[in-house]
Amino acid sequence: KGHPMGGYGGALKQLSIGIASSYGKAYIHGCGNPDEIWTANHDHFLEAMADAAKSIVDYFGGKIVYINIMKNMSVDCDCCAVAEDPCMKDIGILISTDPIAIDQACLDLVYQANDPGKKHLIERIESRNGVHTIEAALELGYGSRTYELIDITNE
């Protein structure tokens, strides 16, 4: 799904904003200064999400399984008061032990989709520099952009 600030909402967004308390959400959105919740530098916000996600990964010692459901994909997140209707057909469910790899795989599947609605979601992702969260997480060293897709629909 898309996200109004992060560009997309996947494992990294859920590890950071999704798990955070109200104060934690403000802290992340404000890049360490909750008083700047809506005025902080946008790329710094994406980096703060990657950093917050790392704290959860570190806390659990990597003992997390990530499940991204690519269904009812809209340019908006369910955190929006009124989200746009889905713009893409369902793609599937991805599972990984690497939050960076699963988010990269999801973005790749959106870009590769044979779906005219993808242009709306891609526009949201790119206009918010959404891939920067993946880049920042990779720089922090808690995952990889490399993955192997295994299709189990015919097994």
Residue map of PLM features:
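Extended, low-polarity segments enriched in aliphatic/aromatic residues
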Residues: K1-E155
